[in-house]
């Protein structure tokens, strides 16, 4: 059981790939490490295709074990449960660059499982998992046209940094992950602090160049430890069936793709499919309807692509650089804190912003510990948005991924906690969809945040772009439709302000997309983004000066950190009483910052006054309003300044001789007292003498009793 090990330097880190010792019944297994962050990746591939299988069933699962960080899971069951949002996003990150590298017609089931088994807090496991998956697939012998490399690129002090540590990443204006083969970039996922298109493209090129060392070392690793390549041959096309389908459907499909309205076009195409299937299966019952649909889909692609390359109008009649008609409404929901309805052609997003307090922040339990997130973004894609029925429930992988992309687009313009002490949640409800719903969510979110009075640094817009390439000729499409997304060779999404890019996502399906092509595409995307921003600025030019009447007002005050315990009180009694009496929410930071959230300004004012009383220092000779809390034989205890207790001795109630304290004072009675002395132990001595004019304390009590009667 001697493992085969490959070790190499990758930037400032050391990468180790090991196989042959663990999980020997899997098709391939690799233990991938980068500076003590270790991910165990397995690949299992079925030798036989499932009966009736007509698509490529690739599954990628990524899971983090808490033992990797020396921790025991929380919760009742004390074990890992369903994948977290972070795990889902990393699974997608692995899936996206490897999926296009399997040949067309390969339908064998493959499962990739990446398990984090050791974690160095300075090294993110996502990159290690991508490298491990590339190595395992390359070793497995399946028809995988890899390997791929992966790189994270940061931008610190105007310099690109390869695979920055988590500490370095906090200083970076860019978090970009790029994956590709030795010849081409396949995937980009990034967020940026408003960088130019030129800087983003340079980062992609830098990352692709640097990851070549990974690809070369995986190739050497495969020579030493790889399994024999599968003897898989692509199925021969059924030319007879193709010609029959072509004769029946091609001309009709050409006419259908001149229908600009999506639903009408889809109805026509569905009718053509049903008709062709009925005719051909009537002639020969052995013909699979799935095969017929595949041929029709290929014909659709050919028709649309050839028209685009020939310079003809697109499916909906637009030119290549035209953005669909925009319609924007803000403040569409009367009781929400901020809302906007953003419509671009047949894609529509209803975005809603909600303001909350510190206690509404999301606590994320990561491998390296808990962290708090003050900006939440949720994307919902209900089936009615595309005119279908379907299951409603927890978000799917796609919804999680689109929500994170939209969040990345907006994050760079969000105010800091000091500038705006609210937790903010944005929800994007996709109510119609025909391409680019994630970028509609970016636009809708920007509008809803401004409607809510969130002081974002600038408006943000997003645009989805496509590319069709045939040999040396290529066409870049602005604001792609759903059909153009499926039929194109590259789709990429860019979000940003007038000053620069905040998020970039690319998925490339073919080789030959050069940096020059990417540059042209990014510049065309910039023009589309500026157009959308212009329309958005007409709808709402700046964030509203006031937040909604229905949103909590957060009032901030500062107290001495040593006094925090006084405000909280024994067992939280004081702060609990304050919140219950006033209907407010109170949060206190360790530095003494107190945040009071209330929809009623008067309630917030009362709380601030009470807190000021609680933290105020008692001064000798000062006169205070107080409340009698206890009556004893030798005097009475009086609460002043929100809970500080002092003693009025029996001799200090009045100048007259007092036989019984109860004759003069009772529990709950409001009195005025003067501080005589603060003893070394902190005990406060009070007096009531000469504080009620000429009347004695006894007379005051009698007057109160008479009024009560």
UniProtKB/Swiss-Prot annotation:
Task: Fetch the SUPFAM superfamilies from UniProt.
Answer: Eukaryotic type KH-domain (KH-domain type I), Nucleic acid-binding proteins, Ribonuclease PH domain 2-like, Ribosomal protein S5 domain 2-like
Please indicate if the UniProt record lists DNA-binding as a keyword.
Answer: no
Q: Name one GO molecular function term.
A: magnesium ion binding
Which InterPro entries does the annotation name?
ExoRNase_PH_dom1 (IPR001247), ExoRNase_PH_dom2 (IPR015847), ExoRNase_PH_dom2_sf (IPR036345), KH_dom (IPR004087), KH_dom_type_1 (IPR004088), KH_dom_type_1_sf (IPR036612), NA-bd_OB-fold (IPR012340), PNPase (IPR012162)
Q: Name one GO biological process term.
A: mRNA catabolic process
This enzyme catalyses: RNA(n+1) + phosphate = RNA(n) + a ribonucleoside 5'-diphosphate
Q: Which GO terms of the cellular component aspect does the record hold? A: cytosol
Domain KH, chain residue ranges per copy? 552-611
- Domain S1 motif, by residue range, is 621-689
What keywords sit in the KW lines? Answer: Cytoplasm, Magnesium, Metal-binding, Nucleotidyltransferase, RNA-binding, Transferase
Could you say which EC number(s) this protein's record lists?
2.7.7.8
Describe the function of this protein. Answer: Involved in mRNA degradation. Catalyzes the phosphorolysis of single-stranded polyribonucleotides processively in the 3'- to 5'-direction.
Matching NCBIfam families, A to Z? Answer: polynuc_phos, PRK11824.1
The entry assigns this protein to a family as follows: Belongs to the polyribonucleotide nucleotidyltransferase family.
Q: How does it assemble?
A: Component of the RNA degradosome, which is a multiprotein complex involved in RNA processing and mRNA degradation.
The name under which this protein is listed is Polyribonucleotide nucleotidyltransferase
What organism is listed for this UniProt entry?
Answer: Glaesserella parasuis serovar 5 (strain SH0165) (Haemophilus parasuis)
């Amino acid at each position: 059981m001697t493992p085969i090990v490959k070790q190499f330097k990758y930037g400032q880190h050391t990468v180790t790939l090991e196989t042959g010792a663990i999980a020997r019944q899997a098709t391939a297994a690799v233990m991938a490490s980068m500076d003590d962050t270790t991910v165990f990746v397995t690949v299992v591939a079925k030798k036989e295709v499932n009966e009736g299988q007509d698509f490529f069933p690739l599954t990628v699962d990524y899971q983090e074990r808490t033992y990797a960080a020396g921790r025991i899971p929380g919760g009742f069951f004390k074990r890992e449960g369903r994948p977290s949002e972070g795990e889902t996003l990393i699974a997608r990150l692995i899936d996206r660059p490897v999926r296009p590298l399997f040949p067309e017609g390969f339908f064998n089931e493959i499962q990739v499982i990446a398990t984090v088994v050791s974690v160095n807090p300075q090294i993110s496991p996502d990159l290690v998992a991508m490298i491990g998956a590339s190595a395992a697939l390359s070793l497995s012998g399946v028809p995988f046209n890899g390997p791929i490399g992966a790189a994270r690129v940061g931008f610190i002090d105007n310099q690109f940094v390869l695979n920055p540590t988590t500490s370095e990443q906090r200083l970076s204006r860019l978090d970009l992950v790029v994956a590709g083969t030795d010849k081409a970039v396949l995937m980009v996922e990034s967020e940026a602090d408003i960088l130019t298109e030129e800087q983003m493209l340079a980062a992609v090129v830098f990352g692709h160049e640097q990851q070549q060392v990974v690809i070369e070392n995986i190739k050497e690793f495969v020579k030493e430890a790889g399994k024999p390549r599968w003897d898989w041959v692509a199925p021969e096309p059924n030319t007879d069936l193709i010609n029959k389908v072509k004769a029946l459907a091609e001309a009709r499909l050409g006419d259908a793709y001149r229908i600009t309205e999506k639903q009408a076009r889809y109805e026509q195409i569905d009718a053509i499919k049903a008709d062709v299937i009925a005719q051909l299966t009537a002639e020969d019952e052995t013909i699979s309807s799935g095969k017929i649909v595949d041929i029709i889909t290929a014909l659709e692609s050919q028709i649309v692509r050839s028209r685009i390359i020939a310079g003809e109008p697109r499916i909906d009649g637009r030119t290549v650089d035209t953005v669909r008609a925009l319609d924007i409404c803000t403040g569409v929901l009367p009781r929400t804190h901020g809302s906007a309805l953003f419509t671009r052609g047949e894609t529509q997003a209803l975005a809603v912003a909600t303001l909350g307090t510190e206690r509404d922040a999301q606590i994320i339990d990561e491998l390296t510990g808990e962290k708090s997130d003050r900006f939440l973004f949720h994307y919902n894609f209900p089936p009615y948005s595309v005119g279908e029925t379907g299951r409603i429930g927890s978000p799917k992988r796609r919804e999680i991924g689109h929500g994170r992309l939209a969040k990345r687009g907006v994050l760079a313009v969000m105010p800091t906690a000091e500038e705006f002490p609210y937790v903010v949640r944005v929800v994007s409800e996709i109510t119609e969809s025909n391409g680019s719903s994630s970028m509609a969510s970016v636009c809708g979110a920007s509008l809803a945040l401004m409607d809510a009075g969130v002081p974002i640094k600038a408006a943000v817009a997003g645009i989805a772009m496509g590319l069709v390439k045939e040999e040396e000729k290529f066409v870049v499409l602005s604001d792609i439709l759903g059909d153009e997304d499926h039929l194109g060779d590259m789709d990429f999404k860019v979000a940003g302000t007038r000053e620069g890019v905040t998020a970039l996502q690319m998925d490339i399906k073919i080789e030959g997309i050069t940096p020059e092509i990417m540059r042209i595409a990014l510049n065309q995307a910039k023009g589309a983004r500026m157009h959308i921003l212009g329309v958005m600025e007409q709808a709402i030019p700046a964030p509203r000066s006031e937040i909604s009447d229905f949103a909590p007002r957060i009032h901030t005050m500062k107290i001495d950190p040593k006094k925090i315990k006084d405000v909280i009180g024994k067992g939280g009694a004081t702060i609990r009483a304050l919140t219950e009496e006033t209907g407010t929410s109170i949060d206190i930071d360790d530095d003494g910052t107190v945040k009071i959230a209330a929809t009623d300004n008067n309630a917030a004012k009362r709380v601030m006054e009470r807190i000021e009383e609680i933290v105020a220092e008692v001064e000798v000779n000062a006169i205070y309003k107080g409340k009698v809390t206890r009556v004893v034989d030798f005097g009475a205890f009086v609460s002043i300044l929100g809970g500080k207790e002092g003693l009025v001795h029996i001799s200090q109630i009045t100048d007259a001789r007092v036989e019984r304290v109860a004759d003069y004072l009772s529990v709950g009675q409001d009195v005025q007292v003067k501080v005589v002395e603060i003893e070394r132990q902190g005990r406060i001595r009070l007096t009531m003498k000469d504080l009620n004019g000429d009347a004695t304390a006894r007379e005051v009590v009698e007057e109160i009793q008479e009024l009560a009667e």
